[in-house]
């Protein structure tokens, strides 16, 4: 009994001393912010797991009270200064990712979750070449071909309602599945595009905070037979099937890798690029290749679907916007059967403006981009942030900051056409300086060119060939972001952007 009392007193004394240190003696004690955040990381757990994906929104709220620099964890600082973004995320910055977030998606050895800067650069090199602009433009006829099939299928549903989210989710899966893995999923062939890939990334995303704070959860899941996991969590059944298909493809490629350099007619995948790279043999295992594939699909599906569906919603919800876009497309492409190339589509000012607004409001990544500098302090005005302190900024705030954007929560393509196509922010700086939907720096979005090609071809083809589309029982709640699970999510249970094909 005495031993228990001694243990209890010792624990109380420990936590009391720890609290005093974190509040008053810690190197970040001079940084303003909520005291609970300074005391413990469990406050973040409460908002992101118990409440559900709300810590990002609390950060935005707290900045209004505490100012542009704020302590949001025992060893983490957050900035909300649009002019500091490019200074913080420079292309030459050799920042590290916090190791404790490595397993938030369960892809611990994939490029995206690579912690070390130099290790990340080595892993990124073969994939960067694979997703370069020249490679994507070379592949763009296939993107157009698949989009043609999608739009043809949409036209077949005349008089019926389809979900834009599901349609473009299916399209993205077919495009990325073939380009990256050499697999044909034929997702757009499913009735009303309700393919197996639908909603999978959202279901996985809702586990991201659990994986970040409690990485052992994924370890336990891997130790349980797949049949049992599928019963407990039905969405996992689709993921297991995807993993099996990817594993089989990797085994085929590994079996024939001796002749990789001689393969001329076979479609080269990310697996070929990685296997033909200068990476260490330990990087070329089937397990790591599978994790790379899962990470890539997760990154592509949710962001592409969200951005395209959001664009369709706002274009249809604003008749003047739809009219201007259709007029521009008709003028540029008198024959709807002949869609311009990606470089030509990029020169259409109103289409480009609609795409930029969709990217701005869809955000891409809603969670803060966390980094730390192990070698040197980070300076922000009069604040010196010590080495090894985690810091970050949110795209959510950067892309909707009222100090930069006029009417930031509205879809206004015209903002991009002002000043002869060189629009200025409210502070007088070029607006492009603050437009960061793909992030910046050495860890910027790998799939930017693929995403832009899909958006240009997808929206141009849809609105040039399908003359009458109308929102059906859909309001702004279908695209309003209400939760952050690394990617932005709309209200749970939403039916998405539903469109009547007339």
Curated annotation (Swiss-Prot):
UniProt-annotated binding residues for heme: 445
InterPro entries hit by this protein: Cyt_P450 (IPR001128), Cyt_P450_CS (IPR017972), Cyt_P450_E_grp-I (IPR002401), Cyt_P450_sf (IPR036396), Cytochrome_P450_monoxygenase (IPR050121)
Protein name stated in the entry: Cytochrome P450 monooxygenase orf6
Gene transcribed to yield this protein: orf6
Gene Ontology BP, a term: mycotoxin biosynthetic process
Glycosylation sites: 382
Function: Cytochrome P450 monooxygenase; part of the gene cluster that mediates the biosynthesis of brefeldin A (BFA), a protein transport inhibitor that shows antiviral, antifungal, and antitumor properties. The proposed biosynthesis of BFA involves formation of an acyclic polyketide chain that is differentially tailored throughout the backbone.
Family: Belongs to the cytochrome P450 family.
Cofactor(s) needed: heme
GO molecular function: heme binding; iron ion binding; monooxygenase activity; oxidoreductase activity, acting on paired donors, with incorporation or reduction of molecular oxygen
Biological pathway: Mycotoxin biosynthesis
Keyword Thylakoid: no
Lipid bilayer topology: Single-pass membrane protein
One GO CC annotation: membrane
Originating species: Eupenicillium brefeldianum
Compartments, as annotated in UniProt: Membrane
E.C. number(s) listed in UniProt: 1.-.-.-
Record key words, sorted: Glycoprotein, Heme, Iron, Membrane, Metal-binding, Monooxygenase, Oxidoreductase, Transmembrane, Transmembrane helix
Induction of synthesis: Coexpressed with the other cluster genes on brefeldin A production optimized medium.
Transmembrane regions listed in the UniProt entry: 3-25
Gene3D superfamilies in alphabetical order: Cytochrome P450 (1.10.630.10)
């Amino acid at each position: 009994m005495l031993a228990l009392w001694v243990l209890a007193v010792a624990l109380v004394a420990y936590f009391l001393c720890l609290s005093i240190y974190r509040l008053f003696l810690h190197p970040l004690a001079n940084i303003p912010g909520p005291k609970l955040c300074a005391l413990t990381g469990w406050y973040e757990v409460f908002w992101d797991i118990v409440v559900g994906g709300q810590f990002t929104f609390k950060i935005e709220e707290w900045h209004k009270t505490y100012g542009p620099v704020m302590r949001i964890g025992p060893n983490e600082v957050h900035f909300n200064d649009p002019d500091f973004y490019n200074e913080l995320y420079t292309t030459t910055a050799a920042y590290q990712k916090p190791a404790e977030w490595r397993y938030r998606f369960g892809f611990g050895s994939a490029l995206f979750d690579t912690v070390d800067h130099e290790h990340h650069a080595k892993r990124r090199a073969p994939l960067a070449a694979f997703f370069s602009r020249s490679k994507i433009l070379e592949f763009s006829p296939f993107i157009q071909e698949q989009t043609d099939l999608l739009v043809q299928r949409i036209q077949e549903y005349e008089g019926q309602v389809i979900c834009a989210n599901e349609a473009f989710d299916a399209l993205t899966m077919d495009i990325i599945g073939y380009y990256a893995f050499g697999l044909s999923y034929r997702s757009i062939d499913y009735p009303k595009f309700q393919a197996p890939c639908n909603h999978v990334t959202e279901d996985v995303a809702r586990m991201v905070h659990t994986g970040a704070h409690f990485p052992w959860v994924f370890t336990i899941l891997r130790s349980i037979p797949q049949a049992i996991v599928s019963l407990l969590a039905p969405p996992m059944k689709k993921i297991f099937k995807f993993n099996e298909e990817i594993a089989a493809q990797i085994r085929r490629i590994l079996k024939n890798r001796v002749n990789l350099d001689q393969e001329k007619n076979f479609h080269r995948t990310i697996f070929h690029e990685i296997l033909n790279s200068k990476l260490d043999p330990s990087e070329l295992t089937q397990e790591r290749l599978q994790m790379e594939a899962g990470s890539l699909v997760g990154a592509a599906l949710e962001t592409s679907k969200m951005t395209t569906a959001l664009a369709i919603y706002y274009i249809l919800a604003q008749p003047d916007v739809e009219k201007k876009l259709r007029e521009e497309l008709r003028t540029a492409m008198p024959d709807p059967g002949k869609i311009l190339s990606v470089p030509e589509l990029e020169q259409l000012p109103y289409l480009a403006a609609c795409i930029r607004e969709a990217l701005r409001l869809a955000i891409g990544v809603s969670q803060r981009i966390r980094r730390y500098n192990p070698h040197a302090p980070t300076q922000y005005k009069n604040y010196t942030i010590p080495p090894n302190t985690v810091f970050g900024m949110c795209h959510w705030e950067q892309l909707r900051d009222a100090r930069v954007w006029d009417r930031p929560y509205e879809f206004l393509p015209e903002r991009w056409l002002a000043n002869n196509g060189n629009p200025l922010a409210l502070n007088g700086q070029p607006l492009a300086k603050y437009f960061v939907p793909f992030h910046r720096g050495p860890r910027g979005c790998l799939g930017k060119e693929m995403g832009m090609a899909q958006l240009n071809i997808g929206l141009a083809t849809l609105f040039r060939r399908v003359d009458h589309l109308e929102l059906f029982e859909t309001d702004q709640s279908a695209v309003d972001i209400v939760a952050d699970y690394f990617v932005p999510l709309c209200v749970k249970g939403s039916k998405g952007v539903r469109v009547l094909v007339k």
